Swiss-Prot record:
ATP binds at residues 14, 172-174, 238-239, 247, 253-254, 270, 274. This is S-adenosylmethionine synthase. InterPro entries: ADOMET_SYNTHASE_CS, S-AdoMet_synt_C, S-AdoMet_synt_central, S-AdoMet_synt_N, S-AdoMet_synthetase, S-AdoMet_synthetase_sfam. It is found in: Cytoplasm. It comes from the Bacteria. GO terms for biological process: one-carbon metabolic process; S-adenosylmethionine biosynthetic process. Belongs to the AdoMet synthase family. Residues 98-108 are annotated as: Flexible loop. Keywords: ATP-binding, Cytoplasm, Magnesium, Metal-binding, Nucleotide-binding, One-carbon metabolism, Potassium, Transferase.
Length: 391
């Protein structure tokens, strides 16, 4: 059976991604000084304006406007003709402390308050909710092919802009890849869409030729492209006005780009700007860690795990898996293995993945999962041999 599946990515200059990167840059700056800080940092951008807001409890000081400007500069918005300038944009901040009602449940989990003997790492979940982790063996990064290819294109767009190969490119951009599957295996790419911001002096014909040569052919395997592959490069015909001048941006608006490109389910919680007591982030990372190690151990060709929490409670309220008919053992047996090999209490996740570190800014563009260019703890295949003992 043949079917098509499509996923998109965006470059670091996309307005929503600017916000994610500022929020995580603030988190990293705080964690560099105070690893036990509580951070929920949200950012909004529009023409000439950055607003950073949220709840932060810490014993250190960081210069948030400076962090925002440096982040914007590193992305590439460093001159007025781009429609957004790190030097001249206004930066407003409005920060409160974390609610004491929330803090009391995170500081001491329900189990601890009830007198259960638990280890010191068992802090309560910072919120209720369900998180999903996914992995598939269809690519070397254990990610679905459509989102993996879309990220390769968006990273390459930024690379050729920053290294001067295509100096007329500007920071904003989006990519999209449609993959054709046969019998659940990716066999070819049916369509590629690239929209990239550019200077007014360049022709559409040059953009199309350059992106085909320096972006698409540079990162997409030739065997996946054929005479029937369709290419849509700047299909509107012009993309000069972009970034925050073209669209307002908000933290947490690219959660599907951040995860599995829609191929796996999503619990709805965003990642950027949140310290790891927020299970929206830490439990989603842990769920990916679980799923990837299970697939690497040969338990299934693809696997999704859902974990759910109650606010102020350490132990998950539920864990369930779906192997989409590819499992070598039953789903119930897989859940039993998860409970034996992994500790999914928030404090244990923070401990085992060493999450109280300034490692988050680098994840805020081009996806949080399948990052072969980064050393991320939730991508480590360090539980495979232990899992195999139970097979």
């Amino acid at each position: 059976m043949r079917r098509l599946f499509t996923s998109e990515s965006v470059t670091e200059g996309h307005p929503d991604k600017i916000c994610d990167q500022i929020s995580d840059a603030v988190l990293d700056a705080i964690f560099a000084k105070d690893p036990n800080a509580r951070v929920a940092c949200e950012t909004a951008v529009t023409t000439g304006l950055v607003m950073v807001m949220g709840e932060i409890t810490t014993n250190c000081y960081v210069d948030i406007p400076k962090i925002a400007r440096e982040t914007i500069k590193n992305i590439g918005y460093d001159r007025a003709k781009y429609g957004f300038d790190c030097e001249t944009c206004s930066v407003m901040t409005t920060i409160d402390e974390q609610s004491s009602d929330i803090a009391m449940g995170v500081d001491e989990a329900l189990e601890s308050r009830a007198g259960e003997k638990i280890d010191i790492d068992a802090v309560g979940a910072g919120d209720q909710g369900m998180m999903f982790g996914f992995a598939t063996n269809e690519t070397e990064e254990f990610m679905p092919a459509p989102i993996a290819m879309a990220h390769r294109l968006s990273r390459r767009l930024t690379e050729v802009r920053k290294n001067g190969t295509l100096p007329y490119l500007r920071p904003d951009g989006k990519t999209q890849v449609t993959v054709e599957y046969e019998n659940d295996k990716p066999v070819r790419i049916d369509a590629i869409v690239i929209s990239t911001q550019h200077g007014p002096e360049v022709s559409q014909e040059q953009i199309q030729a350059d992106l085909m040569e320096h972006v698409i052919k540079a990162v997409i395997p030739a065997e996946l492209l054929d005479e029937n592959t369709k290419y849509y490069i700047n299909p509107t015909g012009r993309f000069v006005i972009g970034g925050p001048q073209g669209d307002a941006g908000l933290t947490g608006r690219k959660i599907i780009v951040d995860t599995y490109g829609g191929y796996g389910r999503h619990g709805g919680g965003a990642f950027s700007g949140k310290d790891p007591t927020k299970v929206d982030r830490s439990a989603a990372y842990a769920a990916r860690w679980v799923a990837k190690n299970l697939v690497a151990a040969g338990i299934a060709d693809k696997l999704e795990v859902q974990v759910a929490y109650a606010i102020g409670v350490a132990k998950p309220v539920s864990i369930i898996v779906d192997t989409f008919g590819t499992g070598k053992i039953s789903d119930e047996e897989i859940v039993n293995i998860i409970n034996k090999v992994f500790d999914l209490r928030p404090g244990a996740i923070i401990r085992d993945l060493d999450l109280r570190r300034p490692i988050y800014r680098q994840t805020a563009a081009y996806g949080h999962f399948g990052r072969t260019d980064l050393d991320l703890p939730w991508e480590n295949l360090n539980k495979v041999e232990e899992i195999k003992k139970y097979l």
